[in-house]
Every structure is written in C-alpha cells, then in structure tokens.
Amino acid sequence: MTQTRRDNSRIIRAKHGSELDATHWAAEAPLRMLMNNLDPDVAEKPEELVVYGGIGRAARDWESYDRIVATLKRLKEDETLLVQSGKPVGVFRTHKDAPRVLIANSNLVPNWANWDHFRELDKKGLMMYGQMTAGSWIYIGSQGIVQGTYETFVEAGRQHYDGDLTGKWILTGGLGGMGGAQPLAATMAGASMLAVECQPSRIEMRLKTGYLDKSATTLDEALEIINAACAKGEAVSVGLLGNAAEVFPELVKRGVKPDMVTDQTSAHDPANGYLPAGWTLAEWDEKRESDPAAVEAAAKASMAEQVKAMLAFWEQGIPTLDYGNNIRQMAFDEGVTNAFDFPGFVPAYIRPLFCRGIGPFRWAALSGDPEDIYKTDAKVKELIPDNPHLHRWLDMARERIHFQGLPARICWVGLGERHKLGLAFNEMVRTGELSAPVVIGRDHLDSGSVASPNRETEAMMDGSDAVADWPLLNALLNTASGATWVSLHHGGGVGMGYSLHSGQVVLADGTVEAAERVGRVLWNDPGTGVMRHADAGYEIAKDCAKEQGLDLPSV
C-alpha cells in the first residue's frame, strides 16, 4: 500500500458557510476541523501532515487523509468511524447519540511505550504521533495555549512579584505551535519576553500572526531591546534566532538575570524536536533521516546543558519552571540528578484551577465568520457576569489574537459553567443568531483527561501521579455521554512512555438532540476532573464536588 508523508502540492483549508460536503453536520464538523488542522495558517508543516509539536500529525499519510475525508463525506447519522493512529479502519452502525468518530492515536503496550519502538512502527507505516490536538482534530493554532500560559504567568506574578510584572522579563525557548503562544501571553500579563528559536520560519510565523513583537539575530541586540522596554515599564516580546542550549548557558555566564525562566522547545521528542548545540539546521535535517540515534544522543546532551543553566537561575532565586515538555526528564537521564529541583507549571501554579474543573474550554465557528465568535464572546460575559479576570481575557483576546483558520476562542472555565455556555451556544445556532453550528472541545491538557507524572499529574498529593485509569474513564464517559468525536492518545506533550490522555469535541447544531448531548458532555467532562482531584484528597475539589452535587461514592 502506497504511503505518502510529504506532498507539497496539497493546500488544505476548511470549508466555510452553511453548505455541507458531508450528509449531516455531525460528520461535516470533524471533516472541517480535520481540514482546519492542516490549514497553512494553522499547521507547522501542513505538506507533511504535521500540525505542531515535533511530528504531531492530523493523519498518518496522505492516502489515509483522503480515505478519512471520503468516509466522513458518506458517513450516515447512525454510523461511527474508527481511526487507528491516523488511518480510518472501520465504519460501524451505532446510533445517533453515539460519537461519529472514535480515535486512538499512538497507543502502545507499556513495556514497548518508548520512542525507539514507536519509530520502528512509524517507519513501517503502522502508527503516527498524534500529539494532543493534532490527531484529534481540534487544534486552533497558538491561541489554544495562550490563555493557559497567560494564567501561569499571571499566577507566577502573584506569587513572586506581588501581582505586578511591569518591568519584568521572562526567558524561554521555542516558538513552535505551542511555544509560539508564550510571547503574547507574556505581554498580555504585563511582562517582556526573550524567546530563543532556532528556525527562522517559526519566528516569521509568530511575527505574521501577531504573537511576537520583534526579532533579533544576536543576543546583544535582543537584550538591548528587552532592557530598554523594562526600563520604560513597557512589555515587548523578542524572538532571538539561536539555540536555547547555547543561549541559556551564555546568559548564566554573563550574569544576566531574567525575572522568570521556562522553556517550550520540543524536548519531548529528542530525535525530531530539539536542535543539538553547535549543529546547523541543514546538518540536523540530514542526520534526522540518516542517523536519528546520533541526533537523539546529541540533543539530550544539549538539553542537559540547558537544564543546568535553568538550575543555575533557580539557585539564584529566579522563578524557574518546566512548561511540560519533559526537558527535566531528558536531562535527568543524562546524569543531571537534580533536574527536578525546579517545579513543573501545573503543581506550581495551575492545580487549584484543575480542582474546580477549570481548564482550556474552546470552541470554533464552522461558518468561518469571525462575527460568530464575537457574539459568543458577548454571551460568555453575559452568562458569567462576575468574573472580571475572564472578561479582561476576552477583551484582550479580541483585540490581540489573530484567528488562524476557522475563527475560534479559548477561555478557562470549569464545572457548572461549561455546560451553560454550550447550551447557550446551541440556542444561538437554533435562533439563527449564529450563522452556522459551532464545535466545542478542549485541549487534552485538562483536569480529568490526562495522566502525565512529569506534567499535569506531577506531585499529586496522594502519590497517584502515574495512575492512568482516569483518562480512560474520561474517554469512556464522554463516549457514553454523546460527544461528537472522542480521542484517546499516548505520549502527547512529554513524549512516548510519559502520558496518556483523552479528548472530546461536541457539536452544537441548534437541535434539541444536540442540546441534550451538549448538556451531558459539558457537565460530565469537567466533572471527571473534579472527581479525579477529590479522589486524590484535594479539599478544593471536595468542596467543589459538594457544591455542584457530584455523586462520588468514595469521597
């Protein structure tokens, strides 16, 4: 069977408007969102089906993509398409309230859950890496992580700088699909940012989409811009063309002191996502094909040097955090025994939100009309009137975030709020206030949908960091609740062997039946997050469960 991974002739964009290519909206929705993942304004390498995160793909190969598209176009209202690591493998009769698509990506039996075995299967065409929202068809560009990054920086500012990041600057690495959100999140939070990125195309994309203010080609130039802005109390973001493994140690050597340090390089995938120190991009590209083991070894050695620099900042009292790319683990494996001295961002800043089921709720307008998103923004403010922080976020998002592909919005809301918003959006579709249906989903990075001991479930108070039952239960419950498509993935964010996670997307098409599904899914999905944290002993989660009337027999 022919398998084509690269096709430069392909330019994919989702259909806009109310005319369907599928036979009904529940199949049209995943069709448009799959295509949206591969829009050139959205994906990192759309010609290779790569959406973000190293080699996070939307489909296994172009032949599989074409078969998925053809199948969705003919899928009946009582049928379910099964997708195995980016390849459509079956259509079965279920019922109208069942998911239209069920997706399993990158899942390996634990003893074989490592990059070496994955790469063997990947090379044979038997598997693909789905990341989190790449293979589950709900990536919305860098906006998808902007608010989570913003919330992290704001909370860090509260904890370390009395809530004021004016005149402060953050050092980071990586401006890919996820890391590209950092500069905008920083300036929204009031801080400047120096972001080190080795690929010029990524800097150019972040400048083009408004996520980055300026670029620099030398460290001196970048520091001059940062220092000038901080002196004036202004917030500016600078993308420095360079290698984080070289720039971080150089800053330590010079005695330069950022006010916060983190990293979002694709360290989770050392063979494909991290440029070794001293290497050119051309050498890196060639060696990834000819000698991936050498690339991985050199990349891990370079990560160790970067983490040593991060530890040096931490030891000087500078807030330093792992932003979930598993770089500490890579350094630890290279002999940096104190790599975990500085914390991950979830236990340091985000877990109290997870305890209340608050996480990255997102929706996209299938019409392609930005006005549909602006109307839903107003509806969120109307239904959640007493949250000025959320209102400020929505105002900033409208002003500063450029839509990529289909217009979309993200805002962090929790149990008791998500279902109200979803039902309101469905009603707006029914009355014609919105010009076409919307899809409502989230990142896999959420309170009840992931087991990842070096990220979302790091340092759980009961020691249950590695218990992977929770994302499985989340996926099963969302399937039973009637989500339009449900996904279960392995290895997203932190790489093979380090995470299991699930996702859901539900369609609001204005029908009574959709309202029932939306209400169930958007209550149950965040409810599993409160359940998971209450079960682990967090009092905030127990209180939330009691307030919301959750039935948790063991709590």
Curated annotation (Swiss-Prot):
This protein's GO CC annotations: cytoplasm
UniProt keyword Lyase, yes or no: yes
Cystine bridges: none
SUPFAM superfamilies, alphabetized: Urocanase
Signal peptide: none
Gene Ontology MF terms in the entry: urocanate hydratase activity
Protein location: Cytoplasm
Active site: C411
Sites where the protein binds NAD(+): 53-54, 131, 177-179, 197, 202, 243-244, 264-268, 274-275, 323, 493
Chief location of this protein within or outside the cell: cytoplasm
GO BP: any one term: L-histidine catabolic process to glutamate and formamide
Keyword terms, alphabetized: Cytoplasm, Histidine metabolism, Lyase, NAD
Catalytic activity line of the entry: 4-imidazolone-5-propanoate = trans-urocanate + H2O
Known pathway: Amino-acid degradation; L-histidine degradation into L-glutamate; N-formimidoyl-L-glutamate from L-histidine: step 2/3
The EC number(s) this enzyme carries: 4.2.1.49
Cofactor note: Binds 1 NAD(+) per subunit.
Record keyword Cytoplasm present: yes
PANTHER family for the chain: UROCANATE HYDRATASE
NCBIfam families in the record: hutU (TIGR01228), PRK05414.1 (NF003820)
Family per similarity comment: Belongs to the urocanase family.
Function as written in the Swiss-Prot or TrEMBL entry: Catalyzes the conversion of urocanate to 4-imidazolone-5-propionate.
Name this protein carries in UniProt: Urocanate hydratase
Species: Maricaulis maris (strain MCS10) (Caulobacter maris)
Taxonomic path: Bacteria, Pseudomonadati, Pseudomonadota, Alphaproteobacteria, Maricaulales
Gene: hutU
